[in-house]
C-alpha cells in the first residue's frame, strides 16, 4: 500500500490515497494504530484516508494513533489540499473537502506550481455546551472552573467540529502539561473526551499555545485548536479577531470576522513516500 508522509508545522500525518489503493474501511482504526506507532510503524499523529465524495472534491477521514476517529483536523486538511493540487487531482485553487464536521474549503496560494500556503474556511464555531459536547446546564462555557488532579482550571469550551477545552495561563512553561493534558482530555464532563489547549496571551494580536490532542497526546501544532484558542480569546476579551498563534514548530494565522466563519492560514509540507505491507 502506497502512502505519503506530510506535516503542517510538525503535526504529521500518513496520507493514503484510496482513489488508487484498496483499503477495507473496517481496517482503518487498526491501520492507524500500527502505522502511527513511532517505534514499530511509520510514525505520525494521524492516518488520513482520501476517499471519493458525492458532495465535494474529496472525502477526508482521519484516525488518531489510538484508533479513534477525529471529526476534523486543520493541519491535515492543509496537507490534503497540497497533495491533491500538486498531483493534478484538482485544478482549482479552491477545494471542497468533506469531513465528519462538514465540508471545508481550503484556498491555495500557488507559486510555480507548488502550494506555498493554504487558507481554510473552518466554518462557524459552536459554543453551546451541548454542541461541544459537555455535561452541565445549557449555555456557553466561558471561564468556568473545572477541577481535576487536585487543581482548578478556568476553561472555555469551543467546538470547531471537534471539542476543545481552552485554558488561559500567565506562564505556559509553568503548566504541568503532561499531567494536566490527559486528565482534562478524559474528564467526565466531556463525554467524547476533548482536545486541550493551554494559552499564554502575548499581545491582543499574538498568543503562544501548547496542545494536548484527544487520542494523540501532545502534538507540535493543531489547526482546529488554534482556531478555538482565538475564538476563546475574543469571547473572554483577551485578543482581537486577527491573531498569530505561535506553536512549537511555527505559526498559524487565525481570523474570526465578527459573527462569521473562522479562517486559518498556514503551510503544509510533504516529507517522503513509501510502501506499507497491507492486504485486504
UniProtKB/Swiss-Prot annotation:
Substrate binds at residues 11, 64, 74-75, 162, 195, 213-214, 223-224. The record marks 164, 213 as: Could be important to modulate the pK values of the two catalytic cysteine residues. This is Diaminopimelate epimerase. The active site is at residues 73, 222. It comes from Pelotomaculum thermopropionicum (strain DSM 13744 / JCM 10971 / SI). One of its GO terms (biological process) is lysine biosynthetic process via diaminopimelate. The keyword Transcription regulation does not apply. Its EC number is 5.1.1.7. It comes from the Bacteria. The gene is dapF. InterPro entries: DAP_epimerase_AS, DAP_epimerase_DapF. Catalyzes the stereoinversion of LL-2,6-diaminopimelate (L,L-DAP) to meso-diaminopimelate (meso-DAP), a precursor of L-lysine and an essential component of the bacterial peptidoglycan. Its main location: cytoplasm. It is an enzyme of class 5 (isomerase). Belongs to the diaminopimelate epimerase family. It catalyses: (2S,6S)-2,6-diaminopimelate = meso-2,6-diaminopimelate. One of its GO terms (molecular function) is diaminopimelate epimerase activity. Homodimer. Pathway: Amino-acid biosynthesis; L-lysine biosynthesis via DAP pathway; DL-2,6-diaminopimelate from LL-2,6-diaminopimelate: step 1/1. It is found in: Cytoplasm. One of its GO terms (cellular component) is cytosol. Keywords: Amino-acid biosynthesis, Cytoplasm, Isomerase, Lysine biosynthesis.
